[in-house]
């Protein structure tokens, strides 16, 4: 019914990511041995409908209950729908949808059952990537840094650089590609910089019924309210040393800081908050990066990108400038991490999540009738 996963050699894996922006499900095929990127495959996307997005929003911040169960059903159905056309793979990496994240309480919840996907798609599924990290004292996020290290080596980078993901929450990975393995000392530093697209999207949804500030058009017509920006940057999170991570809803007062402003001024100020959080976070890098490669939806916002270029003392470019796909990098990351889990390789380290020791987190669910894995 399918190939077993051997101890070495290439594996064709399908990764899926449903991020904190709640826009939809990204899926991407990657060929890897769990260490190096051997090739990129096809990609797919399935947007959430407005009704589905409201179901997901209702579950945010919840750990149990009917809202969480309803969100899980939405996530599973959407993933199965988009994955069906890309399931000719050896292995699937399924992140699920984060609805609650409280690492200081040793809790993180990504809804969606990998077992449901395994049976529906007839492929082994690696899922629940974050729980082991959190149980060992880690933040459980970000998890893409090990893949970022592989990307840096894939593009032939020779000097330290940063990958900046601007989804609902922003996170940055400092990579030294001269280190052979992502778990090597000094290879990586990673953390969440602060809120990114989520508060902008939430504000525009509540004020104007818009899903996002497409092309930065609304922010471009506004002025930044510096008083609100200063209050935002006084939040204790920004004084914490990395590694550190955020839940999508950890800054509920952000929108309150801009509610008295015009639509354009409020959007410009929220955008500036994202850029300022990144700039402040970048001060933690061991040395100035040679460049910052931006991934995630935020790179499509020219106002935000220009704010970053002004704030950071190095080139700021979308990842497409080095041949990578900024819309699919997170999905590709979970394909890569799935293979690492299947082969017993670590997926996070003290320098990326604050976990006590390198850990390979994830549950592997094999569908009935699948050839036994050989690991």
Curated annotation (Swiss-Prot):
GO term, biological process aspect, one: 1,6-anhydro-N-acetyl-beta-muramic acid catabolic process
UniProt GO molecular function: ATP binding; kinase activity; phosphotransferase activity, alcohol group as acceptor
Organism expressing this protein natively: Ruegeria sp. (strain TM1040)
Catalytic activity: 1,6-anhydro-N-acetyl-beta-muramate + ATP + H2O = N-acetyl-D-muramate 6-phosphate + ADP + H(+)
Pathway(s) where this gene product acts: Amino-sugar metabolism; 1,6-anhydro-N-acetylmuramate degradation; Cell wall biogenesis; peptidoglycan recycling
Protein name in the entry: Anhydro-N-acetylmuramic acid kinase
InterPro entries from the UniProt entry: Anhydro_N_Ac-Mur_kinase, ATPase_NBD
Record-stated family: Belongs to the anhydro-N-acetylmuramic acid kinase family.
Keywords per UniProt: ATP-binding, Carbohydrate metabolism, Kinase, Nucleotide-binding, Transferase
């Amino acid at each position: 019914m399918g190939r077993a996963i051997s101890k070495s050699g290439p594996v064709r894996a399908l990764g899926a990511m449903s991020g904190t922006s709640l826009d939809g499900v990204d899926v991407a095929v990657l060929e890897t041995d769990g260490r190096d990127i051997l090739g990129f495959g096809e990609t797919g996307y399935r947007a959430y409908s407005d009704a589905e997005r409201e179901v997901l929003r209702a579950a945010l911040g919840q750990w149990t209950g009917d809202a969480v169960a309803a969100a899980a059903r939405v996530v599973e159905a959407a993933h199965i729908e988009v994955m069906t056309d890309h399931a000719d793979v050896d292995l699937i990496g399924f992140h699920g949808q984060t609805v609650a994240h409280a690492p200081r309480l040793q809790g993180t919840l990504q809804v969606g059952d990998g077992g449901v996907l395994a049976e529906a798609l007839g492929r082994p599924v690696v899922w629940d990537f974050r729980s082991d990290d959190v149980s060992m004292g880690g933040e459980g996020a970000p998890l893409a840094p090990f893949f970022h290290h592989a990307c840096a080596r894939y593009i032939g980078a020779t000097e330290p650089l940063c990958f900046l993901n601007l989804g609902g929450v922003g996170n940055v990975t400092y990579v030294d590609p001269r280190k052979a393995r992502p778990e090597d000392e000094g290879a990586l530093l990673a953390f969440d910089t602060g809120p990114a697209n989520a508060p902008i999207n939430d504000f525009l949804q509540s004020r104007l019924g818009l899903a996002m500030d497409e092309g930065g058009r609304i922010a471009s017509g506004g002025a930044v309210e510096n008083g609100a920006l200063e209050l935002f940057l006084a939040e204790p999170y920004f004084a914490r040393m990395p590694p550190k991570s955020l839940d999508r809803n950890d800054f509920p007062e952000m929108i309150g800081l801009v509610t008295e402003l015009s639509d354009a001024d409020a959007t410009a100020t929220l955008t500036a908050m994202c850029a300022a959080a990144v700039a402040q976070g970048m001060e933690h890098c061991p040395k100035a990066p040679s460049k910052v490669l931006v991934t995630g939806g935020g790179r499509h916002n020219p106002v935000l990108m220009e704010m970053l270029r002004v704030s950071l003392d190095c080139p700021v470019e979308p990842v497409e400038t080095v041949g990578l796909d900024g819309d699919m990098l997170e999905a590709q990351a979970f394909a890569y991490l799935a293979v690492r889990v299947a082969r017993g390789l670590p997926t996070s380290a003290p320098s990326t999540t604050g976990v006590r020791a390198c850990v390979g987190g994830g549950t592997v669910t094999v569908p009935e009738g699948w050839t036994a894995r050989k690991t």
